[in-house]
Amino acid sequence: MAVWFSTSAVVPALTREWGLSPSGQAWMTMAVQLGFVIGALGSAVLNLADRIPSPRFFSISAFLAAFLTALIPLLSDGPGTAIPLRFLTGLSLAGVYPVGMKIMATWTRENRGWGIGLLVGALTVGSAVPHLANFLGGFKDWRLVLYSAAGLAAAGGLLALLFVREGPYATSAPKFDWGYALRAWRNKEITLANFGYFGHMWELYAVWTWAPVFLAASFDLTGIPGRWSGLAAFAVIGA
């Protein structure tokens, strides 16, 4: 998940180099969210996570996200190419986050909540890693941050390919049927649970995008070296 907020961590540098407008800055992150939503819906409709072995699907998606992220410092000279690459990165991450949840669920049953919570915590720290990379040296060159994030994503994909397998509680899913969605809407308990879940992290992702920019501006005003804002952002998001 390090690639998700990789460009968000270097937006100030990209703004200086590419002359990003405020909307361009926002789209560097929003494109990922949009790609993820479309990818997750498409994956669900096509039953990709059940038709392709989950560890393999996870690995392919992680490798693709890493490749697309690395293309930005290699090829991009502005938002015209970077934003589509970010959208495709989000599309790829739809095979990482939800599929990782599925794999974890196959290894847990009574303690499934603990297992999913552990995975979400790991994903959260991973999302914050680009800011740590910024602190450790990426502040001098934004490309190092993106290469670091891409490298971590590729390493995660390789580990999943070599060592991760579905657990003993794996079940085969039925064929996708639009009728299930209609029946779910008729079930009051499920409908209320769904409404509680829809958009459940919109405010958190907004803060994760805004906080590093706020910290960088605050540190700049107080004369604190800018690289320290990366460490502060890592602590805020990772905690």
Residue ranges, per PLM feature:
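Helix-loop-helix hairpin linking two adjacent transmembrane segments in secondary transporters
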Residues: L118-V164
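Conserved MFS/SLC helix-loop-helix module at the cytosolic interface between two early adjacent transmembrane helices
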Residues: A40-G78
